[in-house]
From Swiss-Prot:
Disulfide bonds: none annotated. It comes from the Bacteria. Its cofactor is pyruvate. It catalyses: a 1,2-diacyl-sn-glycero-3-phospho-L-serine + H(+) = a 1,2-diacyl-sn-glycero-3-phosphoethanolamine + CO2. The gene is psd. Its EC number is 4.1.1.65. This is Phosphatidylserine decarboxylase proenzyme. The modification Pyruvic acid (Ser) is found at residue 256.
């Protein structure tokens, strides 16, 4: 059971997890863990499932998925009949009015839909992942000199579950450098998996780029792959002018994570998100929603 904080109701909700029985069996049973290490965490498994989700045969999964997880299709640019395969649906675009962007340059917005954790006063040797599990920031980005620039800074971890809108966006005007890709495995990023696999983010496939934002300094913008995420697709053009809310990219099928790192004294995260993170709870947010401000 995954409990998270709902800002609208000021109360806790229970997340409806896609494939929850499978996740619990895989990460909690000896047989499941053996299968995970031998096959499921490997690129080959995710490529096979990604191949299926790219084929017309997978179209029959769409209606059931929409009904099971009560996805509001009125927010989407396309109707169900427009999608050629499940990945077309999974990477669906939303109408512009579905995710309004705060124009105020001092307002920090969420880069995507999902559940967010926030940690300030970053310790580079011990970044909290979830459920008290820690990892090294040095190991995560594999660049010691760059990592040192973010000592005592702020980290935001946005977890996208399979039922979420899976495109991620820029949080400010600016320019973004080329993407750096780090190979790894394809563990699930669900809290069930995070509690079982130490330093999971450092073991999974991930990509990052330096985003030179106009109002929040140089931000490390990272995407972490997960089980069945066949691809992390970057749609932005490096080193060109970017505007707040512009699309950066999207994930194909699977749960995924976006991580942002800010330098010291650049942002102030909203108190409710910080307080819930201290208690060990994620907060539900949508793309474009204010989550903090310029310091």
């Amino acid at each position: 059971m995954i409990k998270y904080y709902n800002r609208k109701t000021n109360d806790y909700d229970i997340e409806k997890v896609a494939g929850e029985k499978y996740l619990n069996w895989t990460y909690s049973s000896p047989m499941g863990m053996n299968l995970l290490e031998i096959f499921i965490k490997k690129k080959f498994f995710s490529k096979i499932y990604g191949f299926y989700c790219d084929r017309r045969l997978s179209h029959n999964k769409i209606d059931k998925f929409i009904n099971d997880f009560q996805i509001d299709m009125s927010l989407c640019e396309n109707q169900t009949s427009d999608f050629k395969c499940f990945n077309d649906f999974f990477t669906r675009k939303l109408k512009k009015e579905a995710r309004p962007i705060k124009a105020d340059k001092n307002i920090l917005i969420s880069p995507g839909d999902g559940k967010i954790l926030a940690y300030k006063n970053l310790n580079l040797n011990s970044v909290t992942e979830v459920k008290g599990i820690n990892y090294s920031f040095y190991e995560l980005i594999n660049n010691d000199s760059l990592a040192k620039e973010y000592d005592n800074g702020t980290c935001l971890i946005l977890r996208l579950c399979p039922t979420d809108y899976h495109r991620f966006h820029f949080i400010d005007n600016g320019t973004c450098e080329n993407t750096i890709k780090l190979d790894g495995f394809y563990y699930s990023v669900n809290p069930i998996a995070l509690s079982k696999i130490p330093s999971l983010f450092c073991k999974n496939k991930r990509e990052y780029a330096i985003f030179h934002s106009e109002n929040f300094g140089d931000v490390i913008f990272m995407e972490v792959g997960a089980t069945c995420v066949g691809s992390i697709i970057q749609t932005y053009k490096p080193n060109t002018k970017i505007f707040k809310g512009d699309e950066k990219g999207y994930f194909k099928f699977g749960g995924s994570t976006v991580i942002l790192f800010f330098k010291e004294n650049t942002i102030k995260v909203d108190n409710d998100i910080l307080n819930q993170s201290k208690l060990g709870y994620e907060t539900s947010v949508i793309m474009g929603e204010p989550i903090g401000s310029k310091k």
